[in-house]
Amino acid sequence: MHLFKDSLNLIVSSGNGGAGCVSFLREKFKAKGGPDGGDGGRGGDVIFKVKSNLKTLSLYRNGQKLSASNGKSGMGLKKSGAAGSDLIIFVPPNTSIYDADSNCMLFELKNFDDEVVVLKGGRGGLGNVNFKSSTKRTPRFAQPGESGLTLNLRLELSLIADIGLVGLPNAGKSSLISKITASRSRVANYPFTTKIPHFGVVRVSYNDLIIADLPGIIEGASKGIGLGFEFLRHISKTQILVFLIDVSSDDFMSAYDILINELRVYDIGLLKKKRIIVASKLDLEGATENFNQLKSILSEERVLGISIYDNIGINELVSEFFSLVKI
């Protein structure tokens, strides 16, 4: 499990150019050959590139320093030094790059395979062969390589969750997302604990799933009551909906009906999304009987049962997430 990062700072540097070479041709029968010092290689660039299978910025640490390679120095016999290797920083789609010092946005990478050169490497210095003239037949100097550049950047990722947890207030969404991810969604026993989406990431075999703990829905949400419009705006972007229903309450079917009705009224297309019905709080009295009744009533739905405190059904639920989401 990894903490989801939607913003972090990186200090990136392009490579220095290699120094030009001071060299003179020395061959048999040519004791005083002319200058033959080659040019230095260019320094590596800093390139940001979108990678299709990335969903988070978790490849990097906040404040991490990353550098492209320096160019190699020139050599005799007019041989140029090798160019420094570019630094390629892979990011998910919808990543914005800011100058952290000025807070100005520099670039926006939205689509797969988008790429941008953020910093050019330093130019290689000229070798002394370039400075030979009718008045300077044996130049004993060459150019140093140009220094690379450094930027303090802030990356910001626009979050789009694969899975949206929906339910009435206190259905257990925040506790569930805290259980299966590194998120620490604020948990308390009163309605509207979640007022904005909280995001967590589940990682299995280097595949990431982004899960959003969305604000609790109430009856009338489709009319803007409570946090309705905000809730429904966020939910429309997710691939899969997870209806979390508290089966320790005898009103479990009413909770299901409210969720279905509010989605239908706001946008009937939301009901076409893939969904799982998850019965929560199986550890409480009467919950198992209600869970069995829920499965019987919703026989055509995929219904799973969990208990966060007894760890019942958690692994099965995570496996179900990965089987449904297109990684």
UniProtKB/Swiss-Prot annotation:
Gene Ontology MF: a single term: magnesium ion binding
Residues binding Mg(2+): 174, 194
InterPro entries given in the database record: G_OBG, GTP-bd, GTP-bd_Obg/CgtA, GTP1-OBG_CS, GTP1_OBG_dom, GTP1_OBG_dom_sf, OBG_GTPase, P-loop_NTPase
Assembly and oligomerization: Monomer.
GO biological process, one term: ribosome biogenesis
Gene3D superfamilies: GTP1/OBG domain, P-loop containing nucleotide triphosphate hydrolases
UniProt domain OBG-type G: residue ranges: 161-326
Organism: Borrelia duttonii (strain Ly)
Pfam families membership: GTP1_OBG, MMR_HSR1
PROSITE patterns per UniProt: G_OBG (PS51710), GTP1_OBG (PS00905), OBG (PS51883)
Coiled-coil ranges per UniProt: none
One GO location term (cellular component): cytoplasm
Binding site for GTP: 167-174, 192-196, 213-216, 280-283, 307-309
Protein name: GTPase Obg
Keyword flag Cell inner membrane: no
Compartments, as annotated in UniProt: Cytoplasm
Obg domain segment(s): 2-160
